[in-house]
């Protein structure tokens, strides 16, 4: 008997106000970590109408022009016209930045790199599945690709009436756990006032949705909802306040996996909210790529100032080819999940973070995304005593 279910994930464009804030936070981090790899950064941003407020705790020997970094980021996104109500040339930039608490420094710094203590307590999840060629859930993968396509057509001038703010939502139909069709696709995009709704709908379906979605998933039952409220001229930080760290499900697995609650952007890799989640994805992806399971979720947890994880757990949702206890043993044998070793293994002390702030931190194929490597898949497969796996990444 066929078991049919629906699952939905959403994504947002680089011009969405929360993503504007994420990009500012990570742009500041990149500017500092490139000069001072041992900097400690926790940088938050709030954006609204004509103002950006940047705040946080930063301890570093480097210097960065936070105001200019903020303006450049806003302009690069596409908010470069006063008529939009928010632009990088004229917006006010207010900063309130202090230093990291010395109580935290005691537990994190001043040790050998491999014994670097976790920057805070917390729990993180990593996930991978065989649904897509990038070992990610299909709904979030295609939701990201839709808003990336919107940005591409906006920036290259093919659809000049597009504006920076946009959201996508993809509902896929699953049969026996595998995606087989698109049930509903929502694409809401900010636009200039002169474009008609009829022309906008036609262009979005033909130029954004159809080139991205697999054609065999689109049938007579697929619903296309383009700007469902009609007009979307006012958008970005004029329409909504944006805040760093408010799109944590968009940043990860679109709701297909659990989330520990900590955001990524604006945090240097001593913060395990970020580095621990990246490592958990690295572990889960190698387990799936190695053929040990078709789906895998890893949980890892830490205590502030302590290097060793307080727990590691594995869930394979009944798809494991070997016992989960054995998978957990293999993780401990082949992955060092102390923060200092994660940073070293994944080469995280680099200016790579602004690129992660849009279109998801996982399922990316750019070389900077070192946690997407499957270099341990074959090692895990052999250690598990399994036949050759089909490793595609």
From Swiss-Prot:
Show the GO MF annotations. Answer: ATP binding; magnesium ion binding; methionine adenosyltransferase activity
To which pathway does this protein belong? Answer: Amino-acid biosynthesis; S-adenosyl-L-methionine biosynthesis; S-adenosyl-L-methionine from L-methionine: step 1/1
The subcellular location is: Cytoplasm
Matching Gene3D superfamilies: 3.30.300.10
Instruction: Give TM regions.
Output: none
| Reactions this protein catalyses | L-methionine + ATP + H2O = S-adenosyl-L-methionine + phosphate + diphosphate
Q: Which cofactor does it need?
A: Mg(2+); K(+)
> Top enzyme class of this protein?
transferase
- Annotated residues for binding of ATP: 16, 165-167, 231-232, 240, 246-247, 267
**CDD domains (alphabetical):** S-AdoMet_synt
Q: Which GO terms describe its biological process?
A: one-carbon metabolic process; S-adenosylmethionine biosynthetic process
User: What InterPro entries does this protein map onto?
Assistant: ADOMET_SYNTHASE_CS (IPR022631), S-AdoMet_synt_C (IPR022630), S-AdoMet_synt_central (IPR022629), S-AdoMet_synt_N (IPR022628), S-AdoMet_synthetase (IPR002133), S-AdoMet_synthetase_sfam (IPR022636)
Report the domain of life of the source organism: Bacteria
Residues that, per the record, bind Mg(2+): 18
Its biological purpose: Catalyzes the formation of S-adenosylmethionine (AdoMet) from methionine and ATP. The overall synthetic reaction is composed of two sequential steps, AdoMet formation and the subsequent tripolyphosphate hydrolysis which occurs prior to release of AdoMet from the enzyme.
What PANTHER family does the record point to? S-ADENOSYLMETHIONINE SYNTHETASE
* Family according to the record: Belongs to the AdoMet synthase family.
Annotated protein name in UniProt: S-adenosylmethionine synthase
Q: Which organism is it from?
A: Coxiella burnetii (strain RSA 331 / Henzerling II)
């Amino acid at each position: 008997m066929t078991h049919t279910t629906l699952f939905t994930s959403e994504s947002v464009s680089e011009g969405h106000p929360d993503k504007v804030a994420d990009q500012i936070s990570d742009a500041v981090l990149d500017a500092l970590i490139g000069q001072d790899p041992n900097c400690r950064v926790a940088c938050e941003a709030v954006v609204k109408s004509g103002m950006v407020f940047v705040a946080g705790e930063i301890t570093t020997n480097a210097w960065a022009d936070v105001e200019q970094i903020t303006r450049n980021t806003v302009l690069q996104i596409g908010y470069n016209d006063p008529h939009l109500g928010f632009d990088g040339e004229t917006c006010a930039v207010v900063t309130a930045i202090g230093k990291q608490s010395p109580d935290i420094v005691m537990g994190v710094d001043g040790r050998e790199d491999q014994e670097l203590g976790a920057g805070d307590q917390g729990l993180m999840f990593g996930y991978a599945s065989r649904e897509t060629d990038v070992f990610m859930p299909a709904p979030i993968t295609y939701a990201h690709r839709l808003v990336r396509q919107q940005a591409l057509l906006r920036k290259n001038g093919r659809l000049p009436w597009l504006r920076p703010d946009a959201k996508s939502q993809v509902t896929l139909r699953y049969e026996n756990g595998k995606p087989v069709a698109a049930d509903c696709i929502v694409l809401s995009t900010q636009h200039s006032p002169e474009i008609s709704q009829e022309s906008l709908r036609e262009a979005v379906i033909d130029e954004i949705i159809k080139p991205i979605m697999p054609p065999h998933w689109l049938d007579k039952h697929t619903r296309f909802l383009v700007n469902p409220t009609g007009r979307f001229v006012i958008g970005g930080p004029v329409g909504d306040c944006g805040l760093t760290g408010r799109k944590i499900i968009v940043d990860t697995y679109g709701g297909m996996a659990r989330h520990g609650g900590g955001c990524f952007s604006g945090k240097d890799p001593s913060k395990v909210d970020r580095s621990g989640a990246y490592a958990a994805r690295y572990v889960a992806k190698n387990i799936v790529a190695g053929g040990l399971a078709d789906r895998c979720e890893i949980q890892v947890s830490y205590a502030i100032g302590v290097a060793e994880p307080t727990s590691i757990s594995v869930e394979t949702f009944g798809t494991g080819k070997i016992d989960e206890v054995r998978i957990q043993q293999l993780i401990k044998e082949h992955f060092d999940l102390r923060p200092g070793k994660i940073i070293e293994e994944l080469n995280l002390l680099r200016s790579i973070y602004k690129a992660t702030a849009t279109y998801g931190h996982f399922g990316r194929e750019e070389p900077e995304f070192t946690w997407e490597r499957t270099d341990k898949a074959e090692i895990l497969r052999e250690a598990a005593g399994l036949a050759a796996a089909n490793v595609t990444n």
